[in-house]
């Protein structure tokens, strides 16, 4: 039976982005008490749990390839009264990481979802950019190439709010060139 308040509860737990010291005390408490931890990568989550002194946790891999199948397993455990924590490799589950479809399925099945907030790459990038923070939008990763990428950039070119994008370091130079082509050289950009 669950040791978290509320049996059959799914808890999204934000994890550190690069600095394990950013794991909150509340996150450690929830992860310690969870009957099951759904995670993007069991090896990386194992390292995080070890750092926090958490042992004996039951882990279930939930990534972009397994999220749909894993949702059924999570719902079954919730229906048995288990508490399930969800983590990704870094940051908040569901933000350009697995979790969104899982949460939708759990809510549709009538279970409660809670969150332990914490590190968030979009917010960290936004506040350290020096760009306006009162109105902004999160776009995640752009399509990698072709018409989908060109089309998305054209849509974003008319956006007046600050736009937060994710990009891999190896594609950053090409993306900056594409942004300049779509938005013009006068639009400010910050890389965080």
Where are these regions (language model features)?
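Glycine-rich, flexible N-terminal cofactor/catalytic loop recognition
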Residues: 1-64
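Beta-strand/loop-alpha-helix module characteristic of Rossmann-like adenine-cofactor folds
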Residues: 2-3, 7-9, 120-192
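Short glycine-rich anion-binding loops that position phosphate/pyrophosphate groups of nucleotides
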Residues: 17-18, 89-93, 169-171
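Short beta-strand scaffold positions
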Residues: 39-40, 97, 166
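Conserved helicase motor
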Residues: 60-69, 142-146
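Short glycine-cluster motifs
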Residues: 79-139, 143
């Amino acid at each position: 039976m669950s040791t978290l308040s509320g049996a059959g509860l799914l808890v999204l737990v934000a994890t550190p982005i690069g600095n394990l010291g950013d794991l909150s005390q509340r996150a450690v408490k929830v992860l310690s008490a969870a009957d099951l931890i759904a995670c993007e990568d069991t090896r990386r989550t194992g390292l995080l749990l070890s750092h926090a002194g958490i042992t004996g946790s039951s882990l279930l891999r939930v990534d972009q390839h397994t999220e749909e199948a894993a949702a059924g397993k999570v719902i079954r455990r919730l229906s048995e009264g288990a508490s399930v924590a969800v983590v990704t490799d870094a940051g908040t589950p569901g933000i350009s990481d697995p979790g969104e479809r899982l949460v939708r399925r759990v809510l549709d099945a009538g279970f409660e979802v809670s969150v332990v907030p914490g590190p968030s790459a979009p917010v960290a990038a936004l506040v350290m950019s020096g760009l306006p923070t009162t109105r902004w939008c999160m776009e995640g990763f752009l399509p990698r190439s072709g018409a989908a990428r060109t089309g998305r950039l054209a849509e974003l070119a008319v956006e007046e709010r600050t736009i937060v994008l994710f990009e891999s370091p190896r594609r950053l130079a090409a993306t900056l060139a594409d942004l300049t082509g779509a938005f013009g050289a006068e639009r400010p950009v910050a890389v965080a």
